[in-house]
Structure formats: C-alpha cells, structure tokens
Amino acid sequence: MEVVSELVQFMQPNQRLDLKAVALTHVLGLTGSAEGKAAILALDDMLMAIFGLTFDDNHTVAKDAVLSLINLTADEECATKVFHLAKRIQPPFAIVEVAATQISDEQSPLADPWSMVLSNLTRVESLVHEILDILERGEQTLPRLAKAFAQLDYNKKKARLHYLAPIFCNLTQVARGRELCCHARYQLLEKLLPFASYEENVVRRGGTIGILKNVCFDAVYHGVILGEDDNILVAILQPLCGPEEFSDEENDMLPIELQYLPESKTRETDPDLRKMLLECLLQLCSTRRSREILRAKGVYEILREYHKWEARVGLDRDCLLACENVVDILIKKEEEIGLDNYKNVEVPAEQAEKFVQEDVEYVKSLLD
C-alpha cells in the first residue's frame, strides 16, 4: 500500500513526462492482479491521479491511464467501486460523460479503450439505471453513440468501436434500456440490426445478438418484432440460415431477404451465439399469435434445415436442444397446444428437473 501511495506524487499533471510515464506503467501492471487493484482502489488520491492522466497531452500516458481503468472495471465489484468513487472524490470525475464524449468524438484516438471502460461499467446491472440517466441528460448523446456504432468509418483515428455493441446490450438488461432501444425517437434497434451477421468481429456481432435476445425476452416488444416489417425477424434468422434450397412453395413463405440464398451462405460459427438466436425464437413462441406468424414466415422450414446441419456439422448439444424446443412448438397445431400463452403455465420443480434430464439424454442420443 505504501509503495502504491508513493507513486501518486509522480502522477500529477504538472510532473515531468518521464516520471509520469514510468509511474503509470507500474500502476498499469498492478491493475493486472486482484491485489494490485485492491491497493489502488483503497486510495482515492491514486484513482484521482489516474482519472486526471486520462486527459494528459501525451498520448501514451493518456492511453495507459484509460487502460488502467479498463482493468480496474473488469469485474463487477471493482467496476461498482470505480463508479461510486468517481462521484465521491473532489472534484468528481464524470466517468460516464467522459467515456461517451470520447467515443462519439470522431477525432478521438482513445475511443476504443473508453468504449471498453463504459462496456465494463454498464455490465453491472445495478448501475444501468443511473448510467441511463446520465446518457439521457444530453439530448444527442445516445443518437451520437448509435451513429458511431452504425457507421464503420466513423472514427477518423481508426478506432473500430466494436464495444459499443456490448454497451447497448448491457443497457437492454433493464426495461428502460429496452424501451430506449426500441423507441422510434432514437431508432437504435434499426441501426444495430445489420450487425447480427457481421462476420468481421465477434464482439460487435455478439453484442448485437445479445440486444436481440434481451428485447425478445420482453413480451412487450413481440408485436414490434413480428410486425409488418420483417427486419428484426430476418436479423434473428439470417445467421441460422445456410445455402440449402427450398421448394418454391417454401420460399414464398420466407421473408424476401432469406429467399434463394447463395451457395456461399454460411451459418453463425459461434455456438453460444447460435443458442442465443434460438432462444430468441423460443421466446417469440410464447403466444398463439406469435406462433402463427412464425409458422407463416417459414421459421419451421429454416429450423428443419438448421437442425440437420447442427447434428452433422455444428455438433453443439445445447444448440440442438434449443432448436428442438422451438421446433416442438411450431410443429404442433394450435388445437394440440391448447394455450394462448406458454408463460402462464406453472411447471412444478420436480417435473422441470425431469424434463431437463430427458432433454440431455435425447440430445446425447442424437450426437452419439
């Protein structure tokens, strides 16, 4: 602790550059261990010094300061401490505002590391409401962040801003975040949808799919998802589609974007993301109206071919089970189901455990 506290004097804005750089390099190394993070977070002066150096005129010093914040916010407990310490110190450090400003600044060379800091902070669900309060104070903050995400060449310093996807995903953990994402005022969801199939980066793609999952798990938005515009449903289905040919009759059922896909069409390579997409579809199967729309849009036909591929190529048991769960519902007639809303059904705990075990044994038999 004493060694750490001695570094603070060398991390002041008016200190010699070489001393700042060496001291900060040492601090950055300390943030790589739990003990080092604990020592730093126990000293308000040290955290204040790190905050201050994020604005340093020297790019390397400023970058190392932000990288230190990334490490300090890497787990939920430490992220919560950093967030509250930033408010408590004098003068307070507006960490969310600074991050949002840097990310939306086209000329910021530190937009990427700042996006990782904000991603870490928004991952803590207990902080999300307060972070949303801050982001909404500026009328243009959320629209600018959405623009920065949607426009791949937005940052002129070659920052890729992929971590905006998990930021938006984290914000949709809560109902208010989902409302903002789906609100016509911001058109956030519309801007994010194309990146559910973005092959170049799994962080951007995974964050976008996470947003879709969070929205699908909220029945309030099922009407929006399955409205006249097929964009959201297409974003969910496209990564599950392959190059298989359908009959003309089956093709006519599919959304136009999913008809006659080329032979080069590939499926999502990450099994965790495939499972999330299938979980989206399962949530959409909750009501009779939604099930009827999914059947009419050819979702069963798409999953029929997907299931063959997963059993032969993908070979992921969780994905096979997730697919089976959706197919089992869509293949039935509504008269057989006899329910308007599956979510109104209460399943006893012992029966639920039995279903889980049966599912495990069934999927195992498919892959053995």
From Swiss-Prot:
SUPFAM superfamilies: ARM repeat. The lineage of its organism: Eukaryota, Metazoa, Ecdysozoa, Arthropoda, Hexapoda. InterPro entries: ARM-like, ARM-type_fold, Hgh1, Protein_HGH1_C, Protein_HGH1_N. Belongs to the HGH1 family. This is Protein HGH1 homolog. Coiled coil: none annotated. It comes from the Eukaryota. Pfam families: DUF383, DUF384.
